[in-house]
Amino acid sequence: MAGGTLQDRSEEEDVRVGVDRFPERQPIGTAADDLGRDYSEPPAAPLFEASELSSWSFYRAGIAEFVATFLFLYVTVLTVMGVSKSPSKCGTVGIQGIAWAFGGMIFALVYCTAGVSGGHINPAVTFGLLLARKLSLTRAVYYVVMQCLGAVCGAGVVKAFGSALYESAGGGANAVSPGYTKGDGLGAEVVGTFVLVYTVFSATDAKRTARDSHVPALAPLPIGFAVFLVHLATIPITGTGINPARSLGAAIIYDNPHGWHGHWIFWVGPFAGAALAAVYHQVVLRAIPFKSSAHY
């Protein structure tokens, strides 16, 4: 009877879920992919998916991106204006407060929109995920258009509150600061966006989600914190772009030649940084292109 009981137990289905199903320790010399072999990599998204165009969820996601980017520009540009108008920086939140405004808004907005659109709120993030085949080209283009429109509207509302103050504060537009070259600015944007998009890939990694059930709920936190840290580092250099929609919206509403000086940096830099992050995570760390379905 004892032997039969042990046999029955050995044949029982493993009903453990979440982190309890995987061993805590990883033997030296083994790859992380050896853990949790029941995981299957999601299939790559098609470049064009016609069925999306007839789905309400597709348009709803774009609306969510528009509203999120609108709110992002509204709060962050207002914060920049509040700091700029004060004669004494000691009486304002300063650079740290500006960084918290950007990072905090990304944290809140990603949390709110992740279940609807994925919570991109940034063409560079969308571009990186497109390169990783996480979404279709159709959806990526739609997202970028809605993000840019939301950014323009958000900055426009801020300017409507006080045009003179908005103009004197530079409209929150990005520009390379005196003492730095365009190469410095481009490098800062590339590295800053790499940090952000790499964090996005790591925080939303489907394999980690399969292993640790708490990962999706915590994803907005490291993403927002990455934005905060990058702003602390690069506000003195470029005002921190790392988001082409944010840079475009502020430049259009500011409507000043200064806002367009070196504007290409805030598109080329973020897109290059996003591409590097996608390659690093998907090819170097996960080696997805070199795997076959038989390995999962």
Curated annotation (Swiss-Prot):
Protein species of origin: Zea mays (Maize)
GO function term, MF aspect, one: water channel activity
PROSITE patterns membership: MIP (PS00221)
Disulphide bridges: none
InterPro entries in UniProt: Aquaporin-like, Aquaporin_transptr, MIP, MIP_CS
Domain free text: Aquaporins contain two tandem repeats each containing three membrane-spanning domains and a pore-forming loop with the signature motif Asn-Pro-Ala (NPA).
Motif NPA 1: where in chain: 122-124
The family this protein is said to belong to: Belongs to the MIP/aquaporin (TC 1.A.8) family. PIP (TC 1.A.8.11) subfamily.
Coiled coil: none
This protein's UniProt keywords: Cell membrane, Membrane, Repeat, Transmembrane, Transmembrane helix, Transport
Membrane topology: Multi-pass membrane protein
Name recorded for this polypeptide: Aquaporin PIP1-6
One GO cellular component term: plasma membrane
NCBIfam families: MIP
